[in-house]
Amino acid sequence: MTVTSDFTQKLYENFAENTKLRAVENAVTKNGLLSSLEVRGSHAANLPEFSIDLTKDPVTNQKQSGRCWMFAALNTFRHKFINEFKTEDFEFSQAYTFFWDKYEKSNWFMEQIIGDIEMDDRRLKFLLQTPQQDGGQWDMMVAIFEKYGIVPKAVYPESQASSSSRELNQYLNKLLRQDAEILRYTIEQGGDVEAVKEELLQEVFNFLAVTLGLPPQNFEFAFRNKDNEYKKFVGSPKEFYNEYVGIDLNNYVSVINAPTADKPYNKSYTVEFLGNVVGGKEVKHLNVEMDRFKKLAIAQMQAGETVWFGCDVGQESNRSAGLLTMDSYDFKSSLDIEFTQSKAGRLDYGESLMTHAMVLAGVDLDADGNSTKWKVENSWGKDAGQKGYFVASDEWMDEYTYQIVVRKDLLTEEELAAYEEKPQVLLPWDPMGALA
């Protein structure tokens, strides 16, 4: 069909005759789309009270960076630390894990680049499009914790580049694309690619040390708790993790809900090229139905433990009110537009994927033990939402949540066996390879 002037004129006339749309036009052009379509009743239907409420700790702030997955993981440890050691507040250093993730991702990128990939291969174009970025997956975070440990924020504080990472990413990716050309040329010429790679990694390390600061290898840290008890630590970041967190991360698994035809339930999946630490923990997911997905999250919170989760946070999101609900905005009554795509359809057609990781810090259950709304701890600071916390309706969770991390002992024998199987490898651009 060609769009003719007669056809467009008809659209003009149809709009002009629609008094409702003309009224909506006046409201939206003055106040903005979402402000004009906001549903007031959605606030009253999603009050922040929950039958299971695990934390009221002050929230953290990732600022202008894509470190949500790190903040979410470290926040789960943080709550444990605050409760166990009776501190008023505490944060682990998100900048410390950021440094080592950037370093390891650079090495990971170089390893993929020196693989057997032709220049016209779409996979090479995919790698070069974004050699590294801030985002990541749970298993990638585990790989960093296991290799480098963690430190208190007071020991390795924020830098300009960790809080606002755009410049760092721009120039690190510029350097890595140049490194890719150098490495592939070295291979073509029969040179010592490993020796060249070591020199290039020194440049990367120097760049990160200058922009983020040199991370500590050993440190001293002391604090007093609410009972005025004095505690002191001297040692390495890995020793600090073992002493003050001590969680065996191999006891946790990533569970996803991806209802697309190419991903049968109760099977495990990984994604080509997705990772950070060469030789570290493999990114791996178990796909389950949504009802089971939610039951696993509930079971972990009933046991007193918060849940790392990944979602598409921009969908139906009211940031100022702290609401994630399917009825936040009324497009149907105002614009005669209805969004009817299924969760699978949105994944298949590029409308949705995981964009953000947060923490499930509570849930409201009805008399039958079914979830009605969820308490979400975000990492956008105290001015977003309700002192940094959000309320997600159960329907929103169904439609826009894709990943949780839960203890292995919550899985059935059949689920655990499915997880332990050799995973199906998904294409690099699969939506389940999206980085939070």
Swiss-Prot record:
Give the E.C. number(s): 3.4.22.40
What GO cellular component term, any one, is given?
A: cytoplasm
Which CDD domains did the record assign? Peptidase_C1B
Q: Subunit details for this protein?
A: Homohexamer.
Question: Mind telling me which InterPro entries this protein's record contains?
Answer: Papain-like_cys_pep_sf, Pept_cys_AS, Pept_his_AS, Peptidase_C1B
Name the active site residues.
68, 356, 378
Q: Name one GO biological process term.
A: homocysteine catabolic process
Q: Which reaction does it catalyse?
A: Inactivates bleomycin B2 (a cytotoxic glycometallopeptide) by hydrolysis of a carboxyamide bond of beta-aminoalanine, but also shows general aminopeptidase activity. The specificity varies somewhat with source, but amino acid arylamides of Met, Leu and Ala are preferred
Q: The organism's lineage?
A: Bacteria, Bacillati, Bacillota, Bacilli, Lactobacillales
**This chain belongs to which protein, by name?**
Aminopeptidase C
Which key words tag this protein in UniProt?
Answer: Aminopeptidase, Hydrolase, Protease, Thiol protease
Organism per entry: Lactococcus lactis subsp. lactis (strain IL1403) (Streptococcus lactis)
A Pfam family annotated for this chain is Peptidase_C1_2
As for what it does, the entry says: Hydrolyzes naphthylamide-substituted amino acids as well as di- and tripeptides in which the half-cystine residue is involved in a disulfide loop, notably in oxytocin and vasopressin. Also has a bleomycin hydrolase activity.
* KW Protease (keyword) present: yes
* Protein family membership: Belongs to the peptidase C1 family.
Q: In the record, what terms sit under GO molecular function?
A: cysteine-type aminopeptidase activity; cysteine-type endopeptidase activity
What is the uppermost EC class here?
A: hydrolase
